[in-house]
């Protein structure tokens, strides 16, 4: 397999971000060690994440060719791992496979936007702010709707659990137990989505969990939770418990609006 080659030689401004996979970090991509450390998971997924975040697709260009052997050399992994990396990148639409050419990188806008892997990679790249904006807009679209549906259709045991969860959420936040606080936040939002009575909304719970955990990893939560955020979680829980769809929608909207304000996206 030959080294990396631009498929569009006529583009003078085209730059290969990962130079021949020989370990020289390009501007804006960071060192490989930092890239590997950014993704939590087994070694194969570490390599997948590092490879994806350093592809020329991040620069919105298409066309760098590479193969398994290059992944082996670049990341010092076995052929089996290299093939798994290539397959994962193809599944996420980060690359396409072309006969007699190999793997060809794709522009970032063609990646699988709803893949939790892709979301994670973008959050740890130079696309962080636009990814956070897109995800916050997604949350504004789906979470108030999920709160409405949960108020109508969630089982009684789930409805009764939410006020207790919100109280625990407040207690851990006010007492600085942030690790527990963040876990409860993920549980709270996931529980509402999964019990909305809408399988489409339920399927997005893993995406919202990825968003919330990503904010923790990136240190984008305030060290002291805002009282209005705690109040809004209480209000959502009470509205769903009382089967009040409109109040649930309004309170959930306040939660996501507060997130946008905190992240300076609004």
Predicted segment positions?
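C-terminal all-alpha effector/ligand-binding and dimerization domain
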Residues: 11-14, 39, 166, 170, ...
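Hydrophobic, amphipathic alpha-helical faces that serve as interaction scaffolds
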Residues: 111-114, 120, 126-127, 138-157, ...
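Short linear motifs at protein or domain termini
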Residues: 9-16, 20, 30-141, 148
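Amphipathic alpha-helical repeat elements characteristic of tetratricopeptide repeat
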Residues: 45, 129, 140, 160-163, ...
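Cationic, low-complexity basic patches in intrinsically disordered or flexible, solvent-exposed regions
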Residues: 6
């Amino acid at each position: 397999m030959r080294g990396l080659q631009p498929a569009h030689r006529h583009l003078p401004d085209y730059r290969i971000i990962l130079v021949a996979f020989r370990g020289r970090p390009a501007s804006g991509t960071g060192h490989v060690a930092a890239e590997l450390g950014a993704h939590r998971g087994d070694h194969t997924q570490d390599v997948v994440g590092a490879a994806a975040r350093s592809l020329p697709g991040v620069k919105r260009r298409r066309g760098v060719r590479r193969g398994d052997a290059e992944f082996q050399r670049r990341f010092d992994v076995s052929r089996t791992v290299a093939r798994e990396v290539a397959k994962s990148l193809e599944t996420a639409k980060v690359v396409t496979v072309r006969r007699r050419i190999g793997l060809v990188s794709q522009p970032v806008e063609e990646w699988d936007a709803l893949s939790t892997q892709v979301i994670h990679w973008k959050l740890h790249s130079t696309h962080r702010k636009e990814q956070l904006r897109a995800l916050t807009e997604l949350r504004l679209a789906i979470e108030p709707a999920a709160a409405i549906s949960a108020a109508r259709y969630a089982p009684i045991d789930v409805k009764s659990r939410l006020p207790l969860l919100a109280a625990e959420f407040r207690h851990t936040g006010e007492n600085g137990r942030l690790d527990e606080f963040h876990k409860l936040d993920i549980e709270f939002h996931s529980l509402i989505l999964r019990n909305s009575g809408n399988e489409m909304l339920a399927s997005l719970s893993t995406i919202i969990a990825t968003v919330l955990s990503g904010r923790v990893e990136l240190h984008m939560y305030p060290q002291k939770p805002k009282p209005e955020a705690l109040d809004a979680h209480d209000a959502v829980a009470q509205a769903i418990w009382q089967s009040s769809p409109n109040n649930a929608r309004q309170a959930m909207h306040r939660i996501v609006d507060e997130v946008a304000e905190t992240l300076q996206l609004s």
